[in-house]
Amino acid sequence: MTIAFSNFYKDNILDGLKKIITSEFNKMPIYNDYPFINRGGTMFLNIQIVDDIDEEIFTSGALRQISVSIRLYQKLEGVQDFNKNKSIQNRYAERMRSLIEENSNYKVSNTPQWINGSVVDIDYEPDLNEDENNYMACELSCEFMTMQTFTIQA
């Protein structure tokens, strides 16, 4: 007997976040790069799983709390009006917060992908590493509860 695992990070969390965000921001590229890769776009998102905690373990799976970082990058090119660009970026971040909170219990085909999804913090001035210096960024810290099921194959 073997236990089969699925990529529940992608299936339950990342795919849902991408679908929700692209429903509103359909032209914004979304990546899952670690470490950061300079993509050259004017504005893009980078979504990373930053923590995973087993909340409760069952014989058929585990209830897990997944922490996710969503960084919104805006490239700084030429003479920029910092306040105008920061205002645009902040509006995008607040709209993403609303989208996640409107979908706090997210289902696909009546199957729960996550429950109690929320944005716990927005950092409008996150620390940037050297590769990110040509960008203005803000970071949404999110948490989701999801069920990872174990499938036993004979």
Feature map (PLM): residue ranges:
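A short, hydrophobic beta-strand-centered structural micro-motif
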Residues: 41-52
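Charged, amphipathic alpha-helical segments and their flanking helix caps
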Residues: 1-36, 51-154
